[in-house]
Amino acid sequence: MHDADARLTAWVLGTVQGVGFRWWVYSQAKELALAGSASNLVDGRVCVVAEGPKHLCEELLRRLSAHDHSGRPGRVDTVVERWSSPKGEVGFRTR
């Protein structure tokens, strides 16, 4: 059975700016072959948008949220997620 594509928007709160967090997200998304972006927000959060097979988006969310994820820079306190239909993102970029 083919996994349907999905769009994950995740707002990540913690010590996630100025520590290489967006570049880490980029590497995880590329490893999972997801499209989207990781952007710093003015309030200190990082917004992660990822599109691709839902199970791979769920894996990225698990990596973002995991308390024991070694190698992830910074500190993640909270991740708020929203799921929606994909909009046709191509490639993955940091902003």
Swiss-Prot record:
The gene is acyP. PANTHER family: ACYLPHOSPHATASE (PTHR47268:SF4). NCBIfam families: PRK14422.1. It catalyses: an acyl phosphate + H2O = a carboxylate + phosphate + H(+). It comes from the Bacteria. Residues 7-95 form the Acylphosphatase-like domain. Pfam families: Acylphosphatase. Keywords: Hydrolase. This is Acylphosphatase. One of its GO terms (molecular function) is acylphosphatase activity. Its EC number is 3.6.1.7. The keyword Hydrolase applies. Belongs to the acylphosphatase family. It is an enzyme of class 3 (hydrolase). The active site is at R22, N40. Gene3D superfamilies: 3.30.70.100.
